Amino acid sequence: MKVRPLGARLLIKPIQEEKRTEGGIVLPDTAKEKPMKAEVVAVGNLEDSDVDIVVGDKVIFSKYSGTEIKIEDDDYIIIDVEDILAKIED
């Protein structure tokens, strides 16, 4: 299934990082904080925005922003471009 966000929105895929305690115990998903890093999967219409984001960029976003959706058993978030705080550059 292909999803294209409308307006100044992005479709992002959260980057899950494995969390361990200092003792080396891996925390289950229910104990982890919501991720704030993601990879951009699709871009809506950003013509009126001064943001330079393209598919494949990695971004940091506001913790509780966007709408979570599930596509073919994968978790995604549709988010307003204003909720993107930073672009991660390699």
Curated annotation (Swiss-Prot):
InterPro entries: Chaperonin_GroES (IPR020818), Chaperonin_GroES_sf (IPR037124), GroES-like_sf (IPR011032). The keyword Cytoplasm applies. GO terms for cellular component: cytoplasm. It is found in: Cytoplasm. Disulfide bonds: none annotated. GO terms for molecular function: ATP binding; metal ion binding; protein folding chaperone; protein-folding chaperone binding; unfolded protein binding. One of its GO terms (biological process) is chaperone cofactor-dependent protein refolding. Signal peptide: none annotated. The keyword Cytoplasm applies. It holds the Pfam family Cpn10. Belongs to the GroES chaperonin family. Heptamer of 7 subunits arranged in a ring. Interacts with the chaperonin GroEL. Together with the chaperonin GroEL, plays an essential role in assisting protein folding. The GroEL-GroES system forms a nano-cage that allows encapsulation of the non-native substrate proteins and provides a physical environment optimized to promote and accelerate protein folding. GroES binds to the apical surface of the GroEL ring, thereby capping the opening of the GroEL channel. HAMAP family: CH10 (MF_00580). This is Co-chaperonin GroES. It comes from Thermosipho melanesiensis (strain DSM 12029 / CIP 104789 / BI429).
